[in-house]
């Protein structure tokens, strides 16, 4: 998380004002709470599906337990996204967006890149506008090496109208893909070797 926060801080110093992030379930609650700074009571209310009443719950003393008990069900906590604005002490303002993600590993990659490209387009669609919006993708090591959508998304990186000027990829190299050891998960020494095809 410190590396992610530092990357955002440094990019904002260089002129970026919008960040679109996508990630798997592992570490998502940490990112929501510590990078996005989403209030913990709101995160926990989304677990139980009471988030639509979260603000009312905090303001009203008349919200009874029966209403909480029969509220709509919540989504899986590791699927939730968020969006927020942050102001730095020096006055810089940035917008952070963590895109909601289903359980299908890496399928969020083209969504994040597409959302970033759309934001760049609506910022003015000039070459210098590419710097304003930064896509950030977090991956597990096995998913990065093994899911075809990673390659498919990277393959679009230099295609006109799809180029976002680069994406920050953070790979959590925990060396186990569910129950698969690295030696059985890929044919290359490093999980990030796929990226060499696009340098």
Give the ranges of each region predicted by the language model.
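Short, surface-exposed alpha-helical segments at coil->helix boundaries
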Residues: 188-192
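Conserved internal helical-beta-strand scaffold that buttresses enzyme catalytic cores
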Residues: 1-168, 172-187, 198-199
């Amino acid at each position: 998380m410190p590396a992610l926060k530092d990357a955002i801080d440094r990019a904002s110093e260089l002129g970026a004002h919008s960040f679109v992030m996508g990630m798997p379930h592992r570490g998502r609650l940490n990112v929501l709470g510590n990078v996005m700074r989403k209030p913990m009571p709101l995160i926990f209310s989304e677990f139980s599906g009471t988030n639509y009443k979260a603000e009312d719950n905090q303001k009203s003393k008349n919200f009874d337990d029966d209403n909480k008990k029969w509220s709509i069900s919540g989504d899986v906590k590791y699927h939730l996204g968020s969006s927020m604005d942050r102001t730095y002490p020096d006055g810089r303002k940035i917008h952070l967006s963590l895109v909601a993600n289903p359980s299908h590993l890496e399928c969020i990659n083209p969504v994040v890149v597409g959302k970033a490209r759309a934001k760049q387009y609506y910022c003015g669609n000039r070459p210098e506008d590419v710097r304003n919006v930064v896509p950030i993708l977090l991956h597990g090591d096995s998913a990065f090496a093994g899911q075809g959508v990673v390659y498919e998304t990277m393959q679009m990186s230099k295609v006109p109208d799809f180029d976002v000027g680069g994406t920050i990829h953070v790979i959590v190299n925990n060396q186990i893909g569910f129950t698969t050891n690295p030696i059985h998960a890929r044919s290359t020494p490093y999980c990030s070797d796929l990226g060499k095809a696009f340098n």
